[in-house]
Swiss-Prot record:
Pfam families: Cas_csx3 (PF09620). To A.aeolicus AQ_377. InterPro entries: CRISPR-assoc_prot_Crn3/Csx3. This is Uncharacterized protein AF_1864. NCBIfam families: cas_csx3 (TIGR02579). It comes from Archaeoglobus fulgidus (strain ATCC 49558 / DSM 4304 / JCM 9628 / NBRC 100126 / VC-16).
């Protein structure tokens, strides 16, 4: 499993890629990328729902956590900011990823 971290003005995109099938036990070993905790986090990647939940929990201390849905944008699922749960951030992750990424 690898992560790409892309800093944007108002949030940090954490995009993950899974290279082979994973099992829940991997959660004990995942080292999540560090982020600027003054900005929210958008989580993106194809994987099991339990992985998305795990990552959302790990970043709960940031101003907000949003999960990317390619049909909608980034849906806010947790917030300690002016954004509210259910707000949608207009973002196209595929376009951001084209601009180059740093894998961690």
């Amino acid at each position: 499993m690898k992560f790409a971290v892309i800093d944007r003005k108002n949030f940090t995109l954490i995009h993950f890629e899974i290279e082979k099938p994973i099992k829940p036990e991997i959660l004990k070993e995942i080292e999540i990328p560090s982020v600027d905790t003054r900005k929210g986090v958008v989580i993106s990647g194809r994987g099991p729902i339990w992985l998305h939940c795990f990552l959302a929990h790990k970043y709960h201390h940031t101003p907000f956590v949003a999960v990317y849905d390619p049909r909608l944008g980034a849906v806010v699922v947790q917030s300690h900011s002016e954004l509210r749960e259910g707000d949608v951030i207009d973002v196209v992750v595929e376009e951001i990823l084209k601009g180059g990424v740093r894998h961690v």
